[in-house]
Amino acid sequence: PKTFGITSPISLAAAKDTDCTLMQKLIETLKPYGVFEEEEQLQHRILGKLNNLVKEWIREISELKHLPQSVIENVGGKIFTFGPYRLGVHTKGADIDALCVAPRHVDRSDFFSSFYDKLKQQEEVKDLRSVEEAFVPVIKLCFDGIEIDILFARLALQTIPEDLDLRDDSLLKNLDIRCIRSLNGCRVTDEILHLVPNIDSFRLTLRAIKLWAKRHNIYSNILGFLGGVSWAMLVARTCQLYPNAIASTLVHKFFLVFSKWEWPNPVLLKQPEECNLNLPVWDPRVNPSDRYHLMPIITPAYPQQNSTYNVSVSTRAVMIEEFKQGLAITDEILLGKAEWSKLFDAPNFFQKYKHYILLLASAPTEKQRLEWVGLVESKIRILVGSLEKNEFITLAHVNPRSFPAPSENMEKEEFRTMWVIGLVFKKMENSENLSVDLTYDIQSFTDTVDRQAINSKMFETEMKIAAMHVKRKQLHQLQPSHVSPKKKKHSFEGVKLLSLNDSSIDLSVDSDNSMSVPSPTNATRTSPLNSSGLSQGNSPAAPVSFSVTNVQATDVMVPQNNSTENLGGSLNESIPESATHPGFSSTPKPLVTRVVSSMRLVNQLQKPVSNTITKMPSPVAGVKRTSSPSNEDSPKKNKTEEDENDSSISADVDDQNKLETEELKEVHSEEKSSSPVPGSLPFSQQSSTDLSDISVVPATPIPVIKNSIKLRLNR
């Protein structure tokens, strides 16, 4: 039999009747969440139309460039799909990722001019726009109601045959870097499908895992969690280790494998291949920066890249804890003690932590807000990385979902978006008081955002960032009912957080269904924050028994600097490490200052100790999630014969898990001997090049307004 993956499988066991029953229950549980696409025929028809348009356009270009008639008749051209649609896990309302492949005589400029014009002439095409200067250039459109993103790649071929296999590495020869990036999505997707033993089982398992990740707020590559392709590769590796298992078993094995995975050992679906094309590939033996990646998941197509280079100490700790919780729940499901719905219950993020940082991005128009929010969000992981390096902070957990916030000044139109970061502070055994100054951490973040805004020439007047600290109980004072727990029937409307001189800051949040994660259609509709469990009555034990007595929060406005030269780089490019911790300029006066309670300055502004993190911490312990099984949940009762049977079954599951854990260690041993593994080095967040062609941003600081958050924590 064919072996999948770089190691032998853990188990070849086939599905039992109970597994099939559980799989049917899983399918029924998934249906209300809209994870199964209902418009497949429409999408197939639209892609067929698009494919015909591409062929027609390439023939026209060929005639304009006076190619021989014999070549024109067979010139070809083709639309390929990639991402969730190609993997077969496309969800309702999601867009389709497509790639236009053209022969060598068709230029990228042709794609963004004549093909763009051709699309504009189609009645079915709406909302047409091109982003030619993006890291991966793209044309976006809505075709007959279906959102489509089209990339472009020109191959060094005279014609494009219908049976072209993009996995052929020789196709990459003599291509520019933008074409290689554009091809990468299709090549990775196709490789994944060729490396799993059973595509149907893979697809159903991936649908379940993606829904679980979104519901548990750990689905976001840009914020340091995992994106779609990374989740697909983890599921594919699980399928390789259990080639005969069906989805109900694979979901459980997924949590078993990755709750016990020995990070930073990389996840590989196949042995990396050498192609001698001189392209940068992930290899910690050669590239020092690759040794610092915490959770490497390596794409199977050349040039191999780490799809999770954004993962930080905190995001990895959060994900590993979620893997462990997923294992505990699926153990219960296999024992018949829980239903699949429990796995997809959204955890209570807004009750989980005692301290939070709120980030607010605002702009004077909706169009500017969209651009500004995109930039700020792409850099939040830098703030998380800076916070987790603070010697007093154990964990910084950003909620991947942002929320709309109303304008602070009702007389002036303003569009605002808010993100929430949960903090766990270190417990100090020999100190009654703990003074924490987060000014430097916030300043580093705002410096980076400001630099990028000016470099990319997207900055507009009145674009602002605000950051402030709030305690868990203050979150409940926000205006909308979907932020406050529904314990009382009276409205919280009009309640605002108190600040200096009787001024106030209104952090109320409007509902925005477009921001919400999938939720069952037959359940009561809730707003985004509600779906995260904020309305649940029981709050878990606070991670830290500190209280905040002193808080300062300052709005930050990007300065207008018309004389600043273009320092290079684009909106979607990675920022070098040197740019994430810029030096400070002289302190200008803040535009607006707000202080909660009287302020006693503690800790002068200084850089945090650089070597506070010298090893990769284990997942945070002691934080009880709302869905965690607890001994307090059920009172003790006399043991019956049924209980003894349950205990026997439970012991069998535990024994099986332990046995497979030992086999998993053997898998790690095999992988260590056959793959490059990062060395044991001190943690230092590094930017991945990821086929990047960015220029280094100079370290000269751009003057910005200081954003000060200083806390006095009492035990």
Swiss-Prot record:
<keyword id="KW-0464">Manganese</keyword>
<keyword id="KW-0547">Nucleotide-binding</keyword>
<keyword id="KW-0067">ATP-binding</keyword>
<comment type="subunit">
    <text>Monomer.</text>
</comment>
<keyword id="KW-0808">Transferase</keyword>
<dbReference type="GO" id="GO:0046872">
    <property type="term" value="F:metal ion binding"/>
</dbReference>
<feature type="compositionally biased region" description="Basic and acidic residues">
    <location>
        <begin position="655"/>
        <end position="673"/>
    </location>
</feature>
<dbReference type="GO" id="GO:1990817">
    <property type="term" value="F:poly(A) RNA polymerase activity"/>
</dbReference>
<feature type="binding site">
    <location>
        <begin position="228"/>
        <end position="229"/>
    </location>
    <ligand>
        <name>ATP</name>
    </ligand>
</feature>
<feature type="region of interest" description="Disordered">
    <location>
        <begin position="510"/>
        <end position="543"/>
    </location>
</feature>
<comment type="function">
    <text>Polymerase that creates the 3'-poly(A) tail of mRNA's. May acquire specificity through interaction with a cleavage and polyadenylation factor (CPSF).</text>
</comment>
<dbReference type="GO" id="GO:0005634">
    <property type="term" value="C:nucleus"/>
</dbReference>
<feature type="binding site">
    <location>
        <position position="149"/>
    </location>
    <ligand>
        <name>Mg(2+) 2</name>
    </ligand>
</feature>
<protein>
    <recommendedName>
        <fullName>Poly(A) polymerase alpha-A</fullName>
        <ecNumber>2.7.7.19</ecNumber>
    </recommendedName>
</protein>
<feature type="region of interest" description="Disordered">
    <location>
        <begin position="560"/>
        <end position="590"/>
    </location>
</feature>
<dbReference type="GO" id="GO:0003723">
    <property type="term" value="F:RNA binding"/>
</dbReference>
<feature type="region of interest" description="Disordered">
    <location>
        <begin position="607"/>
        <end position="693"/>
    </location>
</feature>
<feature type="compositionally biased region" description="Polar residues">
    <location>
        <begin position="674"/>
        <end position="692"/>
    </location>
</feature>
<feature type="site" description="Interaction with RNA">
    <location>
        <position position="381"/>
    </location>
</feature>
<dbReference type="InterPro" id="IPR043519">
    <property type="entry name" value="NT_sf"/>
</dbReference>
<feature type="binding site">
    <location>
        <position position="210"/>
    </location>
    <ligand>
        <name>ATP</name>
    </ligand>
</feature>
<dbReference type="InterPro" id="IPR007012">
    <property type="entry name" value="PolA_pol_cen_dom"/>
</dbReference>
<feature type="binding site">
    <location>
        <position position="149"/>
    </location>
    <ligand>
        <name>ATP</name>
    </ligand>
</feature>
<feature type="binding site">
    <location>
        <begin position="82"/>
        <end position="84"/>
    </location>
    <ligand>
        <name>ATP</name>
    </ligand>
</feature>
<dbReference type="GO" id="GO:0031123">
    <property type="term" value="P:RNA 3'-end processing"/>
</dbReference>
<feature type="binding site">
    <location>
        <position position="91"/>
    </location>
    <ligand>
        <name>ATP</name>
    </ligand>
</feature>
<keyword id="KW-0460">Magnesium</keyword>
<dbReference type="GO" id="GO:0005524">
    <property type="term" value="F:ATP binding"/>
</dbReference>
<comment type="similarity">
    <text>Belongs to the poly(A) polymerase family.</text>
</comment>
<dbReference type="GO" id="GO:0006397">
    <property type="term" value="P:mRNA processing"/>
</dbReference>
<feature type="short sequence motif" description="Nuclear localization signal 2">
    <location>
        <begin position="624"/>
        <end position="639"/>
    </location>
</feature>
<feature type="site" description="Interaction with RNA">
    <location>
        <position position="310"/>
    </location>
</feature>
<dbReference type="Pfam" id="PF20750">
    <property type="entry name" value="PAP_NTPase"/>
</dbReference>
<keyword id="KW-0479">Metal-binding</keyword>
<dbReference type="Pfam" id="PF04928">
    <property type="entry name" value="PAP_central"/>
</dbReference>
<feature type="compositionally biased region" description="Polar residues">
    <location>
        <begin position="560"/>
        <end position="588"/>
    </location>
</feature>
<keyword id="KW-0694">RNA-binding</keyword>
<feature type="binding site">
    <location>
        <position position="219"/>
    </location>
    <ligand>
        <name>ATP</name>
    </ligand>
</feature>
<keyword id="KW-0539">Nucleus</keyword>
<dbReference type="Pfam" id="PF04926">
    <property type="entry name" value="PAP_RNA-bind"/>
</dbReference>
<dbReference type="InterPro" id="IPR014492">
    <property type="entry name" value="PolyA_polymerase"/>
</dbReference>
<dbReference type="InterPro" id="IPR007010">
    <property type="entry name" value="PolA_pol_RNA-bd_dom"/>
</dbReference>
